[in-house]
Amino acid sequence: MTDNVSPSPIEDQWEFLSSHGFSARFAGTWVEGSDPESAAHILRADPASRLDCDFETAMQWYDPYSSEEIVWVGVHAPEWLHIISLSGVGIAPGPLSADGRRLFYLEYDDGEGGVHGLSYWRDGKSRGQYGRNSNTLGELEVLFNRHNVDATAAQDDESELNSYLHLLGHVTGRFIDQDWLMSPRTLYRIPDDAWSW
């Protein structure tokens, strides 16, 4: 599958996100798909918790160190969805990336070591992980090279996050900007026992 043609990005993607409330923690998932409800079903979200809302409303649930898993799910670009974990430890990438879907997971936690790197999944399996402190590039190497993104040049959390966000903008065909942030999405709660066996 070829990547989309990208628009010009806001240069400092991370500064834009952190200035809108994500400076303590950001956990974002980009996954191929066009049906947010289907993604929520795969995540075993509680359908009764569904709330269609804007960014300002969603951020009322932003509690990055809570154990309650709250996600905001919506369309990112044609054939791509985005899931922001507003609360909780983050989602399991395996099930969402099943059936050939590409998935990227990016996490930043100011209180727990900063940037946790960029993970790439496809067909339910990890296909690459890159970070300043760990490096198993795998299939990510091709994407970094194709889009001329040099993550090795990052000297701090901000520049590292920017390199990943720019790569994701190129791959998905959409960068983060005001229109992206203000697009309505759907809030869901994932029950504590959703992944209990």
Regions found by a protein language model. Give the residues of each.
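Short aromatic/hydrophobic-glycine micro-motifs
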Residues: A45, R101-R102, V149, H170
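Long, contiguous binding/interaction regions
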Residues: T2
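Broad structural signal for hydrophobic residues in well-ordered alpha-helices, predominantly aliphatic
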Residues: A39, P95-L96, L168
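Intrinsically disordered, low-complexity regions enriched in Ser/Pro/Gly/Gln/His and often acidic
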Residues: P7, S23, Y65, V73, ...
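N-terminal "first-domain core" detector
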Residues: V5-L51
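Long, compositionally biased intrinsically disordered terminal regions
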Residues: E11-D12, Y120-W197
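Acidic, low-complexity intrinsically disordered regions
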Residues: I10, F26, T57, E68, ...
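Short, intrinsically disordered low-complexity segments
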Residues: L51-R132
